[in-house]
Amino acid sequence: MLSVAFWPFRLSFLTLLGLLLSSSCTASANEVAFSGFGSVGYSYENEPDIGYLRNISQPPDVERNGSFLPDSNFGVQVDWALNYQWSLTAQWVLEDRVEQDFNNVTELSFIRYLPDANWDLRIGRVGLNAYTAADSRRIDYAHLWVRPPQELYGSIFYDSIDGLDVTYRSSINEVNWSASLQYGAISQVIEDERTKDHSEASSDHTLAIALMFDYHEWSGRFSFVDVADLTVSLGPNSQQAQLGIAQLAQAGLGAASLEAAEIYAQSNINGESVKYWQVGLGYFDGEWQMQSELFYVAGMKQAIPQGSGGYLMLGRSIHRFTPYATVSFFEPARDIVKAQSDWGLISPQLGQFQQLIISGINSTYIDQDTYSLGIRWDIHSQVAIKGQFDYIQINDVGYGLWAADGRSSTQGRDVQLYTLSVNFIF
């Protein structure tokens, strides 16, 4: 839901919607288009004590090996052209997520105004323009891969922004280019595997800037996102843990209290800012397809996932079949948090508490590489069958993209992930 600060924006949005609806009967064009998409995908990974996640906003389950949940979804979209300048768009997606309420299943909901051939203004809920697949992340049929590379798209779990989107499009000779600016509010609910707590991370002051171009077979982009003034609403167990750390920091127990004070400072991210930089390059000539993105995530606190990563995908179409290969990685920009003293010397309970807190901070630590082979078979103009094999090398403690508890996430391992998926549009 939008915060109190955005209620004036929400009221103005509803007022504008009412004006548009009241005037639609006299519009020169009044067309409604319905469309949809979906995927039925089964994924299986070969490790018994960790669980695969398509992205970290999905409910974690370390006991799960094979499941239809992570890579299956169903979406519908309504586009209402009120006239040649004004239109309405709404999109709803059912998929595996922590909370299945109407607000969360609403991926898009905006009014669009096209004053001329260059400007494009949208107000409402739009896709966060932080990566190449900003408007099609959920539409697997639109992409060669089974799923977007986990190292990038699994770590950035903010899919949409509630606010204003302004885009300017033009061309220079044969180069088409556009620049866009977004400003508004974002929020996401995630679940803690250890405590089953639901926590909400939100920001009312998120800025996204993107530059994009295409030239014949080539396309490229640059984007910057500043998620400012983060607010985190913790679940009851996480709140109790934070209170315990604060009390220990003030208990005057020497090294243990000093370490607790540092842990509290690094785990309290309210008011912090997270910044994302991204560059992308693509090529498609009808036969060969290449796509690549590089990104960097920066934050001041150790509880924030941060580092650099990217991927390179290459595929070649052979009639109805397109085999492809992908290499992707995430390199952390911070060190693993380790115990600086032994709280167990004070009491066994404090020793267990120390391990729990440190594993909680390290649960956001990402360090992995993935090598993928796959094939897409277009059996129909609106249906594709895909198979993909992922070989994932996870380094020590680097399980931030997986469902894993403190015991299963200490040592690195190699994981094999197999996926068969049917994607469709209508």
Please report, for each region that a protein language model flagged, where it lies by residue:
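Bacterial N-terminal signal peptides that target proteins for export
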Residues: 1-13
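Bacterial N-terminal signal peptides
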Residues: 12-23
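N-terminal periplasmic/intermembrane-space "pro-region" immediately following the signal or transit peptide
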Residues: 25-51, 421, 426
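Outer membrane beta-barrel
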Residues: 31-37, 41-45, 65-189, 203-207, ...
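Surface-exposed strand-loop-strand hairpins of Gram-negative outer-membrane beta-barrel proteins
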Residues: 43-72, 194-197, 405-406
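Outer-membrane beta-barrel proteins
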Residues: 45-49, 99-102, 130-136, 177, ...
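Outer-membrane beta-barrel pore domains
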Residues: 47, 110, 224, 237-426
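Transmembrane beta-barrel outer-membrane domains
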Residues: 67-71, 101-106, 157-159, 199-206, ...
